[in-house]
């Protein structure tokens, strides 16, 4: 793999280790998972927790956001799939600005676009198409973001 991040290197190492020492294991590659309880310091977490968010590269970085319910279905699928490595990924890429604008529709937020591409940013997320993609009808980002805010409304969580 061609990665420079410690996260990417550790994922690759884990896959290699499993292929040598645990032949029956299925490695699951998850891509930009989001849902009602976002992990700290992810894009969705910043959008939900902050009033002002800065998007580098003018929000044009491209990502494949995968809703958490789809990840759960994919992990269940992985249990008996007899494949060494699979992708659990919504392969409909969107810009980070588009994703942020979906959140902004439901929550007041100021989005600052910064015209700076940082050295460690990947402009476009790459999904290795040679790795098997779990066949699901993945949740669109529009529907996923709506689900998040419907859940918050149901639980009476406001800003």
Residue spans of the language-model regions?
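Active-site beta-alpha turn of Rossmann-fold NAD(P)-dependent dehydrogenases/reductases
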Residues: 4, 29-31, 89
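C-terminal substrate-binding subdomain of Rossmann-fold SDR/epimerase-dehydratase oxidoreductases
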Residues: 55-159
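Active-site loop immediately N-terminal to the catalytic Tyr-X3-Lys motif
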Residues: 2-3, 40
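NAD(P)-dependent short-chain dehydrogenase/reductase
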Residues: 12, 16-63, 68-70, 103
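Active-site YXXXK catalytic motif of short-chain dehydrogenase/reductase
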Residues: 3, 7-11
């Amino acid at each position: 793999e061609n990665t420079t991040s410690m996260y990417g290197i550790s994922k690759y190492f884990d896959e290699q280790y499993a292929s040598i020492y645990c032949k029956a294991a299925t490695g699951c590659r998850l891509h930009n998972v989001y849902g009602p309880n976002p992990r700290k310091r992810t894009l969705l977490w910043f959008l939900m927790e902050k009033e002002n968010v800065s998007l580098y590269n003018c929000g044009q970085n491209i990502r494949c956001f995968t809703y958490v319910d789809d990840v759960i279905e994919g992990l269940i699928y992985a249990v008996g799939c007899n494949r060494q490595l699979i992708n659990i990924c919504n392969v409909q890429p969107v810009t980070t600005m588009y994703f942020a604008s979906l959140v902004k529709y439901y929550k007041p937020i100021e989005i600052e676009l910064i015209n700076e591409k940082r050295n460690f940013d990947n402009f476009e997320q790459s999904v290795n198409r040679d790795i098997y993609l779990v066949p699901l009808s993945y949740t669109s980002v529009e529907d996923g973001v709506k689900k998040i805010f419907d859940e918050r409304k149901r639980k009476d969580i406001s800003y």
